[in-house]
Design a protein with these regions (language model features):
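Cofactor-binding loop segments of dinucleotide-utilizing enzymes, especially the Rossmann-like FAD-
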Residues: 8, 31-32, 88-90, 128-130
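Internal alpha-helical scaffold of NAD(P)-dependent oxidoreductase catalytic cores
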Residues: 36-43, 119-145
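Short, solvent-exposed amphipathic alpha-helical segments in soluble enzyme
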Residues: 20, 79-80, 142-144
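Short active-site oxyanion
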Residues: 1, 24-28, 58-62, 81-85, ...
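NAD(P)+-binding Rossmann beta1-loop-alpha1 motif at the extreme N-terminus of oxidoreductases
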Residues: 1-48
Length: 145
């Protein structure tokens, strides 16, 4: 799958590694701080973009790995309308994405992640989708990680 990741912290770093190892293509890393995005993007030959005025690439899935408190402001980010969007926050409902897209859900890693980890252990994911198709897509994607 072609992937865009929003975030450059612990979860984004670990998930990016898993995505790349699974053979998916990371197109972009987006962060409020473009320099932070550039550091992570350089590891995967991806583009770095700012969340302030993003121009997102056309991807199969957009993974939002931002702080839980930032999810309420996703509607202000241009370029996500009607994309397949998932977030990684376990404490936030999938419906925080309902005004952004018609296909959305959650891809939540069921353990604490740190970007300093030398070897990434096998990570179980909790998945949730707003409809059967979204749930199927997220489940199949998670199985590859």
């Amino acid at each position: 799958m072609r992937v865009v990741i929003l975030g450059s912290g612990n979860v984004a770093t670990v998930i990016s590694s898993l995505i790349q190892k699974a053979g998916h293509e990371i197109l972009q890393i987006a962060s409020r701080n473009r320099d932070h995005a550039a550091i992570l993007a350089s590891k995967y030959n991806a583009d770095a973009v700012s969340l302030i005025e993003p121009e997102f690439a056309s991807a199969d899935i957009y993974i939002v790995a931002l702080h839980d408190a930032s999810l309420d402001s996703l509607e202000k980010i241009n370029g996500l309308k009607n994309k397949f969007v998932v977030h990684t926050a376990g404490s936030v409902s999938k419906d925080v994405l309902k005004n952004i897209s018609s296909t959305y859900g959650i891809l939540y890693p069921l353990q604490t992640l740190s970007k300093i980890t030398e070897q990434i252990p096998e990570i179980p994911f909790l998945v949730e989708g707003n409809n059967k198709e979204a749930l199927h897509q997220i489940t199949e994607f998670a199985r590859t990680l």
